[in-house]
UniProtKB/Swiss-Prot annotation:
Record localization: Cytoplasm
Region Disordered: start-end pairs: 174-200, 239-258
Key words, A-Z: Cytoplasm, Signal
Pfam family, one: But2
Family indicated by similarity: Belongs to the but2 family.
Protein name per the record: Uncharacterized but2-like protein C27D7.11c
Main location: cytoplasm
Length: 463
């Protein structure tokens, strides 16, 4: 499945931080990064080689999203008068947008600036735009190189947003302009330090023979811990991914012990997310199959289509507020749904759609294994409803011009323990985009959460 390469500047990115129920930026002093050290993160939902990867400056000065070119550590940057530097080397941007750090100051580029202030840092702009590009490097197509222009021509290049994150919490005495800010207030706390790695292990039983005349269910479970760390603070998220398939009656198979472990570390700099301050985390889930002998493989039933399809995560999440019909939330990281009498805060989710296989399913899942969720309602249960929309939300979508609703998709209840809901939907056309709206069904129903992949939390689409 190929994900869209549409740039996600200022998403996840303003996508990806929502500090309260709307994405209203904090007030900030001029040049907040001037003279301060910070890290840089690439943001692009759905690309495991790009999303939430730190910036590494190689020996040649080129910038990569993984260790490469003689460097093993994510770089620490400073910025002054529009010039971006690492140590005594300064960023120079070539005609095709390649960014290279050089000790020769004669070719230094001065077009870097601070974008929107968000609770975990600031978006980074070049020449007034946030449209950076990440492309597979010429040496290793799993290590991406950073460009602030057209890129190197590789068809797998993707647009990215660049997030500058300070190693300490951003101090601010400002309040959030939100109709429900009094409902949930946020406070800044020092970032914690947590260290671990991401490990995936699959083990099957040594020389075990199974014979049955009824249906046999085989389950593979991937347990994983994802850690993001770099100088400042660390995010750790743990969860599990399970694939289940049913084999036909009368099955005899022998399984061998086979253990495989992989480890991956992602760099993150900045304060730890909370229910009111989070960073976009929507990479692709990885499904690990059961390991069996050739004999058992020949008799195994074909897995169901849903088990073989990756979930799609929204590339855009927007809040619309009936009390501020012209307010533009921008793209946010944390969806919020709320109703108080006639006042609504709804969330619109937009997905990029690859090749459609035939049947489509919308899934909503929340539990307590990921970042904190907040659910309120009568007796602690909120009631919510989903709609499909007549058109796709865009950067100018607000409450007053929101797309029309075509029909109700379904209703679900949610509590502080979470919820799980799935429903078949009309498939969108291949290689297009589609939007869905979530709103509260009853008065005082409230829901906020963090869309993430490890563990899988939030709204996803399978096609």
């Amino acid at each position: 499945m190929k994900f869209s390469s549409i740039p996600i500047a200022s998403t996840l990115l303003s996508l990806l931080v929502a500090s309260s129920v709307t994405a209203s930026p904090l007030r900030r002093r001029d040049d907040p990064l001037n003279g301060r050290q910070f890290g840089l993160l690439a943001l692009h939902s759905g690309n495991e080689y790009v999303h939430l990867h730190g910036f590494y400056v190689g020996d040649s000065g080129s910038v990569y999203l993984d260790p490469a070119d003689g460097t093993d550590d994510a770089a620490t940057f400073t910025m002054s008068n529009g010039q971006l530097s690492v140590g005594n080397r300064y960023a120079s941007v070539s005609a095709n947008g390649e960014i290279v750090f050089k000790s020769d100051t004669n070719s230094t580029s001065s077009g870097f600036s601070v974008g929107e202030a968000i609770s975990s840092g600031y978006s980074l702009k070049y020449n007034g735009t946030e449209s950076a590009v990440a492309c597979p490097s010429l040496v290793n197509n799993q290590v991406y190189q950073v460009f602030f222009g057209v890129g190197n021509g590789n068809p797998s290049c993707v647009g990215i947003a660049v997030l500058a994150v300070l190693p300490q919490p951003i101090s601010s005495s400002s309040t959030y302009n939100s109709t429900t800010s009094s409902y949930h207030n946020s406070t800044s706390t020092p970032p914690p330090t947590i260290t671990s790695t991401k490990a995936s292990t699959v083990t099957s039983t040594e020389a075990t023979t199974v014979t049955t005349t009824t249906a046999v269910t085989v389950t593979a479970t991937e347990t994983y811990t994802v850690t993001a760390t770099n100088g400042g603070s660390t995010i750790t998220s743990t969860g599990a991914s399970t694939v289940t398939s049913t084999q036909p009656s009368t099955v005899t198979s022998t399984q061998r012990k086979n253990t495989a472990t992989t480890t991956k570390t992602t760099t993150y700099v900045g304060p730890s997310p909370s229910a009111s301050s989070v960073v976009a985390y929507t990479t692709k889930c990885i499904v690990v199959p059961v390991i069996t002998t050739a004999a058992s493989q020949s008799e195994a039933a074909t897995p169901s289509p849903s088990a073989a399809v990756y979930p799609l995560f929204p590339h855009g999440i927007r809040l619309i507020d009936s009390t501020k019909p012209e307010a533009n939330s921008g793209n946010v990281y944390s969806p919020v749904v709320f109703q108080k009498q006639n006042n609504h805060t709804n969330t619109i989710f937009t997905f990029d759609v690859p090749q459609v296989s035939g049947s489509c399913e919308l899934n909503f899942h929340l539990d307590t294994s990921g970042f904190p969720i907040t659910v309120e309602g009568v007796n602690g249960t909120g009631r919510f409803i989903l709609f499909n929309l007549s058109s796709v939300a865009n950067d100018s979508t607000v409450y007053s011009n929101r797309p029309n609703r075509i029909a109700e998709i379904g209703r679900f209840n949610c509590s502080s323990s979470g919820c799980d809901y799935a429903t078949n939907v009309t498939c969108p056309d291949s290689y297009t985009a589609v939007s869905y709206e979530m709103m509260a069904l009853t008065d005082d129903s409230y829901l906020s959460f963090f869309e993430e992949a490890d563990p899988l939390e939030g709204l996803t689409l399978r096609v």
